[in-house]
Structures are given as C-alpha cells and as structure tokens.
C-alpha cells in the first residue's frame, strides 16, 4: 500500500482515484473545485480544496510523506507546470504529471516531473490499433518501442506447441500467457499447445509484433 497525492480530480483524475482505491492505496485528493472534490470523496482517504500553485498550501500537506504525487490538472498547463515544479522543490519523492502534447512533456520533465503520461494520446493509439484489426482484442503500451497484445492464434500456429514454434528465436516475441473463456493462464511452457479457441498475450517490440501478427 502506498500513500498517493492526487492533484486534479477531473475525469482522468477521478478514474485514477477509483483505480487506486480498488488497489488498496491511501489517496489524498486536491482540487480547486468543491463539486469535483465531493464527487471523488467515496474513493479517497482524504480530500482538500485548495490551490496547488500556492507553495504554502502544498507545504501544509506534507509533500515528503507521499510515495507518489500525481498531477492530472487539465485545461491549464501553466498551473500544471507550476504545481509540478513546486512539488519537487518541496521534496516530492516521485512526480507523475499529465501532458497533452510532446512539448508539454518536455517542459514538465525539465521542471520536476519524473514521469509523464498522455491519456488522450495513449487512448487514441489504443483505439486506432484495437478497432482496425479484427484479430487484436487488447493492447498495452509498455514504452514507445514495446507493447503487449492480446491476439488470436494465427492459423499456422494452431495445433502446435510454443516450443515447436520457437517464437522467441524467430520473432523476438515472448508469449506471456493464454486466455480462454475469460480466464488467463500464465503458466506457459514449451509444451503449451495453441488452439483456435484461445487468445495469446504476446510481448515484444512493435515492429516485431506488427510483422508477426500482420497488424
């Protein structure tokens, strides 16, 4: 369990609060908008209405006590940048900030952010891949070069074992697991047989995955 400071409780921030709550973490939420704070109250440990660009207000929260500070302010990049910078100045251990464009990410990283997330960009990429390939069922981006795809078993692989196909050597791809009837099995061995009734979870470089599965 970690102690999380969440600044900004718009739609993206609220979704993060819900997920963190489900994972059992302690979350303090901060926003200037009382209505948004009230909306997120069921999912957080504590909440404060306040201006995150005010150094004294942030200092009163005890920034150094949080394991991670997440800045999800939208619609006002200046406030997001100032908040990110102040958090680091006040001793934040890890600052994760939201960006909408690459230029914003560069400024955030130069001014205190340890990591940057692009919710809109990442969702757009997911949708573009997921809904233009009938054999792709899910997609998780690891970084700019690597991803995990849930994909149907290629026709030429059906009835063969993982070891027989030698997927890692041929394609540089790792089979992490298989899914059948909504259940995931990650106990993959060279003897694991592939059928048309399952989907596979494959990890690798984008180029290798695209070539292998014709994405």
Task: Label the model's feature ranges.
Residues 1-215:
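Cytosolic regulatory regions of ion transport systems
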């Amino acid at each position: 369990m970690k102690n999380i400071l969440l600044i900004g409780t718009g739609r993206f921030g609220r979704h993060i609060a819900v997920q963190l709550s489900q994972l059992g973490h302690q979350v303090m939420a901060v926003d200037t908008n009382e209505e948004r704070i009230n909306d997120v109250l069921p999912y957080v440990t504590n909440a404060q209405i306040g201006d995150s660009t005010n150094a004294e207000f942030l200092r009163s929260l005890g920034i150094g006590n949080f394991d991670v500070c997440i800045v999800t302010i939208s619609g006002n990049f200046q406030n997001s940048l100032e908040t990110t910078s102040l958090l680091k100045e006040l001793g934040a251990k890890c600052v994760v900030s939201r960006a909408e464009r690459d230029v914003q990410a560069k400024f955030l990283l130069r001014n205190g952010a340890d990591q940057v997330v692009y919710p809109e960009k990442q969702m757009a990429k997911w949708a573009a891949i997921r809904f233009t390939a009938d054999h792709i069922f899910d997609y998780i981006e690891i970084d700019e070069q690597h991803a995990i795809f849930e994909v149907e078993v290629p026709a030429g692989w059906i009835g063969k074992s993982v070891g027989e196909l030698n997927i890692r050597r041929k394609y540089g791809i790792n089979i992490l697991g298989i899914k059948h009837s909504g259940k995931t099995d990650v106990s993959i061995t060279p003897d694991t047989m592939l059928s048309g009734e399952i989907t596979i979870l494959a990890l690798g470089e984008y180029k290798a995955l695209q070539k292998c599965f014709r994405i």
